[in-house]
């Protein structure tokens, strides 16, 4: 096969070859940050999923006892003053309130998912209560 002569062609604006040696030297010459490491951050949603699993496993009450007791006494004042409560009565109220709220939030989440959302909104709570027959 006969050799052909190579002719010079006009450049079409391609990438210029990088100067790797100059870049390495510039990195070494630049002052370092002093070894300060950034704090570790989880991806968005990872911690939320971990909390969901943790609270679904647990059985302890999630509302603090004393603030709940104050709220019960404040609401009871509207009906009759000087009411007294056994501690077991307030405990039973708190158990039932938390069970109700958990089931309401489960239904609310289903309403949000039905609307093709992952964030619950007040209209989801209203719809869940309406479907349960709690609010007309």
UniProtKB/Swiss-Prot annotation:
Lineage: Eukaryota, Fungi, Dikarya, Ascomycota, Pezizomycotina
SUPFAM superfamilies per record: Histone-fold (SSF47113)
Record PTM N6-acetyllysine, positions in chain: 10, 15, 19, 24, 28, 37, 57, 65
Any one annotated GO CC term: nucleosome
Major localization class: nucleus
The protein's role, per its UniProt record: Core component of nucleosome. Nucleosomes wrap and compact DNA into chromatin, limiting DNA accessibility to the cellular machineries which require DNA as a template. Histones thereby play a central role in transcription regulation, DNA repair, DNA replication and chromosomal stability. DNA accessibility is regulated via a complex set of post-translational modifications of histones, also called histone code, and nucleosome remodeling.
Organism: Coccidioides immitis (strain RS)
Organism domain of life: Eukaryota
Modified residues (N6-methyllysine): 5, 10, 19, 24, 28, 37, 80
Alphabetical keyword list: Acetylation, Chromosome, DNA-binding, Methylation, Nucleosome core, Nucleus, Phosphoprotein
Residues in coiled coil: none
Annotated protein name in UniProt: Histone H3
Region (Disordered): 1-42
PTM remark: Phosphorylated to form H3S10ph. H3S10ph promotes subsequent H3K14ac formation and is required for transcriptional activation through TBP recruitment to the promoters.
Residues with the Phosphoserine modification: 11
Location of the protein in the cell: Nucleus; Chromosome
